[in-house]
Amino acid sequence: MSDLTKLTLAGARDALKKKEITSTELTGAYLKEMEAAAALNAYVTVTADKAMEMAKASDAKLAKGEGGALEGLPLGIKDLYCTKDVLTTACSHILDGFKPAYESTVTSNLWRDGAVMLGKLNNDEFAMGSSNETSHYGSVVNPWRRKGSDAKLVPGGSSGGSSAAVAANLCLAATATDTGGSIRQPAAFTGTVGLKPTYGRCSRWGIVAFASSLDQAGPIGRDVRDTAIMLGSMAGHDEKDTTSVDRAVPDYEAVLGQSIKGLSVGIPKEYRVDGMPGEIDELWSRGIEWLKAAGATVKEVSLPHTKYALPTYYIVAPAECSSNLARYDGVRYGLRVDGRDITDMYEKTRAAGFGAEVRRRVLMGTYVLSAGYYDAYYLKAQKVRSLIAQDFASAFSEVDVLLTPTAPSAAFAIGEKSDDPLSMYLNDVFTVPVNLAGLPGISVPAGLSGEGLPLGLQLIGRTFDEETLLKAAYAIEQAADFKAAPEAWWKA
């Protein structure tokens, strides 16, 4: 079989079961592609020896007709996930040299089902960013380029390594995390599918925390089927995570292709924001027509507090981040910068170890939690968060899913927004409300911009109703028939 890395995860799974290929061959092909794609900077750690060992073990199982749901399938793992005895840094200088003594629950689930680890993927430092430019290991480069231009573009963030690796065929699928859009926006920027499950659907245990009430693990894949398969392995109750919900994990793949006739789709009127490019609006209109043609009914709904979602998020998330990041002090692991006394050591270690964006968010969070400002900012933000959740609950009393754009633009150039944090934060305008309400959301590639870059549509579902979400996403995917792929300029 030629060019093994072009197979989808589902296609590779079936080929392995039929013994048309081996996991060793497949894994070797990916390791070769990864080596040729160093210019994309998608991986920060390559675990080649471990990958081949895991592949050989999978081949032995497959030869006997055994194996799990992901047996022998090579995946990339976001560097936010703790992987036992494998460097895990959250792409921060402050975690230099940290090799966890334990495995995250989600990656444990993947290895239980037979998956193979290719390596750790680049991300924004501590997942704080929308462009993968804040990583200590440098920016990830989007495999896509504008027509007639060789300018390097961002792959989105914070899961930019995950989205770039999937788009460039450097893994079959990847784990990612989403705190304010960090799965869906990178997927939209790279022509991949990104699924943020309901808060509590996947365990957060062993994933480096950014904002604990918002963080959620999820997959990025080449198509809707691949993300459904991945979620089936990643999801599940975990007693080690008190926010993990004890609910049965459905067969997500089984719902794909089911009719959406009679499905009610809501269009939030507040998402028609000023200054949104016409091509994004046109794509949204096409998405509406695709769903209608598949038998769905469409109606306008209102989410009146959506306009407050970004400021609410940028109070709640930094507040939680300032608390979570207090644990990085140079005492037990990671970077340590010597000082005159322990307080001086703390200060010097944190100043040297955290990048500019992380320091900015820690300061913002500390400020909104401080005496005299807690009530004015943090408490008010939590109240608005409740109103945003109520808006969604009201909308879902009328409709089954919501359809919106994923991002207000296509991918932008590296460095284009670095000096303008507010402009960068606005990139999350369509994704942040979903996290504040704890809902599932998925981004599906649906077309190309005038400059030849991928654009995504976002579907939002009811809590723990990923099945309906995936069913609708599959209908969009079939109608959009998105077959475009980036030219492999990095191999030239």
From Swiss-Prot:
It comes from the Bacteria. GO terms for molecular function: ATP binding; glutaminyl-tRNA synthase (glutamine-hydrolyzing) activity. GO terms for cellular component: glutamyl-tRNA(Gln) amidotransferase complex. The active site is at residues 78, 158, 182. Pfam families: Amidase. PROSITE patterns: AMIDASES. Keywords: ATP-binding, Ligase, Nucleotide-binding, Protein biosynthesis. It catalyses: L-glutamyl-tRNA(Gln) + L-glutamine + ATP + H2O = L-glutaminyl-tRNA(Gln) + L-glutamate + ADP + phosphate + H(+). SUPFAM superfamilies: Amidase signature (AS) enzymes (SSF75304). InterPro entries: Amidase (IPR000120), Amidase_CS (IPR020556), Amidase_dom (IPR023631), AS_sf (IPR036928), GatA (IPR004412). Its EC number is 6.3.5.7. One of its GO terms (biological process) is translation. The keyword Protein biosynthesis applies. The keyword Ligase applies. Allows the formation of correctly charged Gln-tRNA(Gln) through the transamidation of misacylated Glu-tRNA(Gln) in organisms which lack glutaminyl-tRNA synthetase. The reaction takes place in the presence of glutamine and ATP through an activated gamma-phospho-Glu-tRNA(Gln). Heterotrimer of A, B and C subunits. PANTHER family: GLUTAMYL-TRNA(GLN) AMIDOTRANSFERASE SUBUNIT A (PTHR11895:SF151), TRANSAMIDASE (PTHR11895). Belongs to the amidase family. GatA subfamily. This is Glutamyl-tRNA(Gln) amidotransferase subunit A. The gene is gatA.
